[in-house]
Amino acid sequence: MTKSFFGGIWHDRYILASFVNRDLQARYRRSLLGVLWAIITPLALSIIIGTVYAVLFNQDIKVTIPILFAGLNPWTFITASAGGGNTAFINAEGYLKQLSVNPQIFPLRTVCIGFINLLYSMMAFYVLYLVLQPQAFGAEMLMVVPGLLIMFVFCWGFAQIASVANL
């Protein structure tokens, strides 16, 4: 069962890559800033909310904003994966009727799109962290990589469950 599941996804990997690429291009096509929206939106939200929290609760703004940004990025990815997985088969109805592809690529498609946006915003997080707290920036920051992979697998499973539950 596992071999056929992953084998089907591996067999349709080029279709999956094409869908992800096309969805990302369509998402940012008519935008003046393009992919920068994936960076600017969580960054601006973190700066605004972090500034308000720092003033209201008398906290150091250099600590509050990176912590808020570090929590907002994964949360945005999880909610995008769950929401996209919930409607993955409904949105792909036309493809499922016309093409002979593994249907499990459609929830994975939404998770891949969210993960790419997460990687963009993580780059902004590292730059922000380097600017606000350069003394705390070190090799231990690389420990986020295994965490991102675990979160990708979790969100993929969650999107699979949500997509099947919504049929």
Language-model regions: role of each:
Residues 1-167:
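Hydrophobic transmembrane alpha-helices and immediately adjacent juxtamembrane helices
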